[in-house]
Amino acid sequence: MAEFPSKVSTRTSSPAQGVGASVSAMRPDLGFVRSALGVLALLQLVLGLLVWALIADTPYHLYPAYGWVMFVAVFLWLVTIVFFIIYLFQLHMKLYMVPWPLVLLVFFVAATVLYITAFVACAAAVDLTSLRGSRPYNQRSAASFFACLVMIAYGLSAFFSFQAWRGVGSNAATSQMAGGYS
């Protein structure tokens, strides 16, 4: 029968070391905020907030067109917040199995199309649902204007995401690992 060893070497580690490493990885990437994609995301968040806040301050529930505008504005605003946080804290680097440039491209193209429909619905319904010069008229007109600006911002993001997905101006593998923002 085999002898049991008289000495056993063991190693211990502090659990605080592992926690500190994950906290330091959660630092915000200020380079993303300064990039074209980061600036456009901030613009989309601010302008999208203006769109749904202006519509929400009117009796929008009486008109189906504004229900659609509210759905598009709030839904895309929330999804943009999620993507902004993912890129700001570099969580896309930890989720490397997700093709982030393609995901962003699909999202931004879909967001552009949805905001085109929301802008058209909002702009077309202003005269039909409000008296010219009234407070709801002015708010809905302003919401239409900001919806147009958000639509343009999402379109620009789709263009930049397409370039990142194609790898224009850089190695495609480097673009994937760098998060695809310039």
Swiss-Prot record:
Phosphorylated. It comes from Rattus norvegicus. Residues 1-35, 90-99, 163-182 are cytoplasmic. One of its GO terms (biological process) is regulation of transcytosis. Belongs to the MAL family. Residues 57-68, 121-141 are extracellular. Detected to the sciatic nerve, brain and kidney. In the sciatic nerve, found in Schwann cells; in the brain, in developing oligodendrocytes, especially of the corpus callosum, of cortical white matter, in the optic nerve and in the stratum radiatum and stratum oriens of the hippocampus. In kidney, segregated to the apical surface of renal tubular epithelia. Keywords: Cell membrane, Membrane, Phosphoprotein, Transmembrane, Transmembrane helix. GO terms for cellular component: apical plasma membrane; compact myelin; membrane; membrane raft; myelin sheath; plasma membrane. Residues 32-166 form the MARVEL domain. Pfam families: MARVEL. Residues 7-16 have a biased composition (Polar residues). Residues 1-20 are annotated as: Disordered. The chain crosses the membrane at residues 36-56, 69-89, 100-120, 142-162. It is a multi-pass membrane protein. It is found in: Cell membrane; Myelin membrane; Apical cell membrane. The modification Phosphoserine is found at S9. Forms oligomers. Main component of the myelin sheath that plays an important role in myelin membrane biogenesis and myelination. Plays an essential function in apical endocytosis. Regulates epithelial development through the regulation of apical endocytosis. Part of the intracellular machinery that mediates basolateral-to-apical transport of ICAM-1, an essential adhesion receptor in epithelial cells, from the subapical compartment in hepatic epithelial cells. This is Plasmolipin. GO terms for molecular function: identical protein binding; structural constituent of myelin sheath.
